[in-house]
Amino acid sequence: MGLDDSCNTGLVLGLGLSPTPNNYNHAIKKSSSTVDHRFIRLDPSLTLSLSGESYKIKTGAGAGDQICRQTSSHSGISSFSSGRVKREREISGGDGEEEAEETTERVVCSRVSDDHDDEEGVSARKKLRLTKQQSALLEDNFKLHSTLNPKQKQALARQLNLRPRQVEVWFQNRRARTKLKQTEVDCEFLKKCCETLTDENRRLQKELQDLKALKLSQPFYMHMPAATLTMCPSCERLGGGGVGGDTTAVDEETAKGAFSIVTKPRFYNPFTNPSAAC
């Protein structure tokens, strides 16, 4: 080895793909022939040695110098890429943490704002107090119109210095109260009607019981009117119709249709009894 060779010695740390020693020596021996170095099998390796000594590089071995340069370039690129990936991971991890913190802050802020809005809504509902003039005007408008269209609602809200939503809620509550009062009135009326019908039903039940008792107390026979007797013309003559020698002419149809009773005359003889002569 000459002076130039001693000056070129140094430590080399390589990380990358390098050929195995057998393939490398075989490639150096056949450097003069046309060999495509792309087909040389490359294995991952990590070496720390003097430059030129581990591979026994000779002068004029251009192929060996080219492979060493490729190995060092591969190791530099891999180290740079690994460092860049690590930095990207660190940056991405930091960004993820920052995004998570920002999301948490947004959620907390939204919850706080919602709670604040709810408190404001409750306080607004509690603070709403109508004056006598506003109440009177609302009552007058309700008597005219129980429901309002959007234009009427806007005009009334401007007149009362209120929001349209407040006017709408007041009208809704007023309609509900009116309906409740009407329901109570109807309920009282129906109660009175029910009481009246109950009394009438009780009275009718009593009358029905009285009629049933009267029907049971009546006798089972019926009273017949007294029969009228008619006399035939001969009976009338015997009874004294021929006094004075006057005779009455009787129609044949009347004599035939009349009810006649024929009786034998009975004469009492006081001398028929022998004890009577004594």
UniProtKB/Swiss-Prot annotation:
This is Homeobox-leucine zipper protein HAT22. Residues 190-211 are annotated as: Leucine-zipper. It holds the Pfam family Homeodomain. It comes from the Eukaryota. The gene is HAT22. GO terms for cellular component: nucleus. Belongs to the HD-ZIP homeobox family. Class II subfamily. Residues 123-182 bind DNA. It is found in: Nucleus. Probable transcription factor. Residues 72-82 have a biased composition (Low complexity). One of its GO terms (biological process) is response to abscisic acid. The modification Phosphoserine is found at residue 92. InterPro entries: HD (IPR001356), HD-ZIP_Homeobox_LZ_Class_II (IPR050762), Homeobox_CS (IPR017970), Homeodomain-like_sf (IPR009057), Leu_zip_homeo (IPR003106). It comes from Arabidopsis thaliana. GO terms for molecular function: DNA-binding transcription factor activity; DNA-binding transcription factor activity, RNA polymerase II-specific; transcription cis-regulatory region binding. Keywords: DNA-binding, Homeobox, Nucleus, Phosphoprotein, Transcription, Transcription regulation. SUPFAM superfamilies: Homeodomain-like. Residues 68-103 are annotated as: Disordered.
